[in-house]
Each structure stands twice: as structure tokens, then as C-alpha cells.
Amino acid sequence: MTRLVKALVIAYQRFFSARRPYRVCRFEPTCSEYMLQAIDRYHSRGILMGLARILRCQPFARGGYDPLPDHFTLKRNQPK
């Protein structure tokens, strides 16, 4: 399952995201990069983390730097 999701995310990055003249994602790393990192670190639970991040990425979101946390969570990292 994780291989399929990773393949879909990579296809999205190469064929859709790369063709846009501007950056769409409000977060750093982008939502697709975050999803790939989450799957690599947390396997199938990383898919849930990536989906939660995509749901947070909307026009009224604060955005900014939101790295992958050290532990599994579906919430945004809180600045220290």
C-alpha cells in the first residue's frame, strides 16, 4: 500500500506540480514532500499524517515551516 501511495505522490510531483508556474503549497516542506517523508518514517501511519497535512493546506491556513515531527501525530508542529 505504501509503495502505491508513494508512486502516486511522485507522479503528482513530476507531472502536475512541476508544471505549475508558481508554488501552491503554503507549507515548507511541501505537502507532497511531507507525505513521502512521513511514509518513509512511519510506513502506513505516515499516509494518515500526509492526508492530515493535505487537509490543513487550504487558503486560510497559516502555512510556514512545518517539519515532520519526531513522533506520530496528526496535528501540526507547534512552534517553540
UniProtKB/Swiss-Prot annotation:
Location in the cell = Cell membrane
Q: Which Pfam families match?
A: YidD
One term under GO cellular component: plasma membrane
How does this protein lie in the membrane? Peripheral membrane protein
Q: Give the UniProt keywords, A-Z.
A: Cell membrane, Membrane
Cite the InterPro entries for this sequence: Membr_insert_effic_factor_YidD (IPR002696)
Q: What is its main location?
A: membrane
Signal peptide residues on this chain, from the entry's feature table = none
Q: Which family does it belong to?
A: Belongs to the UPF0161 family.
Give the function comment from the record.
Could be involved in insertion of integral membrane proteins into the membrane.
Q: Which HAMAP family does the record associate with it?
A: UPF0161_YidD
What's the protein here called? Answer: Putative membrane protein insertion efficiency factor
What are the leading ranks of the lineage?
Bacteria, Bacillati, Bacillota, Bacilli, Lactobacillales
